[in-house]
């Protein structure tokens, strides 16, 4: 293991943790979370920590958790199926207008963003009347949704079709980017919205109730699990796979609407948008075969990186992003980071940085510069360069992107 590109953390109890964190900080809180996960009796071989690893609600963001015989709903969390989509267009930088505000405005009119009215009837982040093609997509998702509700009526969420094709809040974004050759890309980041949140929250509590009922002691109550062979396990896996499909459809609809809106804006010449398409989940569960065994792999803030797999690793607002190709490294369970990773909490970022700091950090990017997005300022994140250097054995860079427009909720 002398030539290994990762550090090995060996807990007193449990499996090892292989951490691709050389040259990037690993906070104590995240390390402790990883040590708790490593103690679970159903972890397969080891836990893998990506270079963007940081403390998260429920489980560590940037972790890959392979399991046999059980699943931890909080390890997936509430933004089930969160992920990325990027499309290279036939446009180049010289064909964009000098003032990009009109492009940003066209995107913000085509995609509902943010959350207001506590998610109520006047929420600007949901469609008041879903477009017809969104209704058609929902029709394909609805039968499985109704089957889930038949068993768990409490999972019903009022914003179903009206959240399809919407961005959300937090670190979700839409960007117009330029690659190393000056080609224009559209890139976005979002998940399963309110429906997925309802699913995640419900099953996390269900698992905790099961632990109390069975009097099972855990190093962290958030690591409550559902044993394979139980109805709750099967029902959760079904629900989470449905939410992942919903999240993918959400991103696809947003991208379609963005392409149409920019194309109809009159600000750019006619273009095509099928040059290269990359799409990946980074908050999800999948059955996979590793070291000859079929296991459930939970990637919480990590991207599958089998040999040849294309993935997206975004930086922060004002930092580079990367289109990558997986190397299929078995030590990481064929995974890589999902971004730069937070260097501090949102609360800490708001205390530490000012609007002026944020304006300077996002110079040259058409984006929000107000106090409400300071928690997403580039300084709140780790260095994407250091993160990429730490995972050179996991992925190779295919394209380097820099954003020129960024839309946040």
Task: Outline where the language-model segments fall.
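Active-site cofactor/substrate anionic-group-binding motifs, chiefly glycine-
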Residues: 55-85
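Compact, glycine/acidic-enriched structural inserts
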Residues: 83-120, 126-127
């Amino acid at each position: 293991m002398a030539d290994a590109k990762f550090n090995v953390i060996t807990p007193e109890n449990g499996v090892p943790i292989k951490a691709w964190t050389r040259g990037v900080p690993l906070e104590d809180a995240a390390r402790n979370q990883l040590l708790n996960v490593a103690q679970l009796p159903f972890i397969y071989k080891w836990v893998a920590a990506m270079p963007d690893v940081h403390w998260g609600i429920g489980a560590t963001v940037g972790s890959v958790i392979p399991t046999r015989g059980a699943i931890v709903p909080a390890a997936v969390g509430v933004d089930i199926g969160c992920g990325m989509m990027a499309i290279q267009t036939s446009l180049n930088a010289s064909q964009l207008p000098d003032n990009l505000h009109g492009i940003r405005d066209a995107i913000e009119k085509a995609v509902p963003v943010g959350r207001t009215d506590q998610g109520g009837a006047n929420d600007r982040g949901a469609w008041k009347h879903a477009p017809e093609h969104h209704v058609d997509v929902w029709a394909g998702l609805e039968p499985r949704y109704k089957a889930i509700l038949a068993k768990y009526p409490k999972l019903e969420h009022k914003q179903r079709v009206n959240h399809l094709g919407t961005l959300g809040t937090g670190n979700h974004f839409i960007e117009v980017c330029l690659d190393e050759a000056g080609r224009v890309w559209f890139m976005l980041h979002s998940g399963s919205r309110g429906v997925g949140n309802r699913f995640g929250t419900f099953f996390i509590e269900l698992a905790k109730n099961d632990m109390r009922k069975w009097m099972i002691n855990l190093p962290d109550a958030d690591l409550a699990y559902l044993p394979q062979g139980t109805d709750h396990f099967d029902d959760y896996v079904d629900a989470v796979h449905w939410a992942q499909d919903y999240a993918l459809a959400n991103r696809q609809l947003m991208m379609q609407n963005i392409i149409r809106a920019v194309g109809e804006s009159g600000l750019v010449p006619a273009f095509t948008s099928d040059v290269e398409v990359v799409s990946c989940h980074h908050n999800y569960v999948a059955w996979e075969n590793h070291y000859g065994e079929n296991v459930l792999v939970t990637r919480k803030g990590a991207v599958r990186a089998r040999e040849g797999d294309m993935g997206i690793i975004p930086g922060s607002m004002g930092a580079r992003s990367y289109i990558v190709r997986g190397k299929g490294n078995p030590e990481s369970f064929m995974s890589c980071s999902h971004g730069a990773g937070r260097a501090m909490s949102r609360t800490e970022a708001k205390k530490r940085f000012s609007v002026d700091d944020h304006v300077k950090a996002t110079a040259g990017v058409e984006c929000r510069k107000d106090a409400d997005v300071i928690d997403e300022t580039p300084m709140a994140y780790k260095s994407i360069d250091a993160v990429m250097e730490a995972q050179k054995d996991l992925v190779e860079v295919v394209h380097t992107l820099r954003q020129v427009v960024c839309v946040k909720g």
